[in-house]
Amino acid sequence: MLHCDKTYLINLPHRTDRLRIAKQQFDRAGIAMPTIFPAIDAKRLKLRGTVEDNQGLIGCFLSHYFILQEALLNGYKRIAVFEDDVLLSANFSARLTEAMAQVPDKWQMLYMGYYERSGKAKVQVSENITIPKNTWGTHAYMVQNDGIKIMYDNLQTIRSHIDVQISEDIVPKMYTYCISPAICFQSGIKSDIK
């Protein structure tokens, strides 16, 4: 259904509560449990000049960055990335199959979950696919082919939250689409990003 070389679930090892809920989500959707990617805990890194409030932001950013790096090193053609606070829609599998049949062949990034910020209208491509114009969120996405390298190359410096940086710096450079309406959401579980 995801047809990925690798599917990742980012999880801080001490957040077993989030891992348990994520596992329930994938079981309910009939999807094999993704490979757990141990999230970077920036609180354990010795970062000079880093304000404590930024540690969660840095850890999240680096977790996504190192997944992209691993994908490049292993020659993966398509990966899916989920954060451990993801909630899959009740009809996730059917909606994903439907959307994958509609997404243009040249896609490089596909948001399965996201938040639309106001200000810019999205462009409707098909019944279930839009082009993002002002989108945040990294809780559920796929990236493929040279999109993996484009993302990796454009995330060499941490300037902001990763989803903001992707939206502002990377989305305009790639064939990026959203499944619309979204099929993944974020739970209200307490976040480790302040």
Which role does the model predict for each range below?
Residues 1-82, 86-194:
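An acidic/histidine-cluster motif and surrounding catalytic segment
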